[in-house]
Amino acid sequence: MNPLISAASVIAAGLAVGLASIGPGVGQGTAAGQAVEGIARQPEAEGKIRGTLLLSLAFMEALTIYGLVVALALLFANPFV
């Protein structure tokens, strides 16, 4: 195995996980903040807001998991070797 390809794969895997988690992390923080603000304004809508928030958080977290899958593929099933 070429050490240059191995090093590039490790760096690419780290970047894949790191960059794939930035967007969803910011989005989840913003969504949670807005949900808390919405519940504070309208406490009677708490159930509907919470359900929508949890569903949207799951979709955002899926993007991070896709980045993790790409990183694991680069580390353990490297297509460049």
From Swiss-Prot:
Belongs to the ATPase C chain family. The lineage of its organism: Eukaryota, Viridiplantae, Streptophyta, Embryophyta, Tracheophyta. The keyword Transport applies. It comes from the Eukaryota. InterPro entries: ATP_synth_csu_bac/chlpt, ATP_synth_F0_csu, ATP_synth_F0_csu_DDCD_BS, ATP_synth_F0_csu_sf, ATPase_proteolipid_c-like_dom, F/V-ATP_Csub_sf. In plastids the F-type ATPase is also known as CF(1)CF(0). CDD domains: ATP-synt_Fo_c_ATPH. F-type ATPases have 2 components, F(1) - the catalytic core - and F(0) - the membrane proton channel. F(1) has five subunits: alpha(3), beta(3), gamma(1), delta(1), epsilon(1). F(0) has four main subunits: a(1), b(1), b'(1) and c(10-14). The alpha and beta chains form an alternating ring which encloses part of the gamma chain. F(1) is attached to F(0) by a central stalk formed by the gamma and epsilon chains, while a peripheral stalk is formed by the delta, b and b' chains. GO terms for molecular function: lipid binding; proton-transporting ATP synthase activity, rotational mechanism. GO terms for biological process: proton motive force-driven ATP synthesis. Keywords: ATP synthesis, CF(0), Chloroplast, Hydrogen ion transport, Ion transport, Lipid-binding, Membrane, Plastid, Thylakoid, Transmembrane, Transmembrane helix, Transport. Its main location: plastid. F(1)F(0) ATP synthase produces ATP from ADP in the presence of a proton or sodium gradient. F-type ATPases consist of two structural domains, F(1) containing the extramembraneous catalytic core and F(0) containing the membrane proton channel, linked together by a central stalk and a peripheral stalk. During catalysis, ATP synthesis in the catalytic domain of F(1) is coupled via a rotary mechanism of the central stalk subunits to proton translocation. This is ATP synthase subunit c, chloroplastic. The chain crosses the membrane at residues 3-23, 57-77. The record marks 61 as: Reversibly protonated during proton transport. One of its GO terms (cellular component) is chloroplast thylakoid membrane. It is found in: Plastid, Chloroplast thylakoid membrane. It is a multi-pass membrane protein.
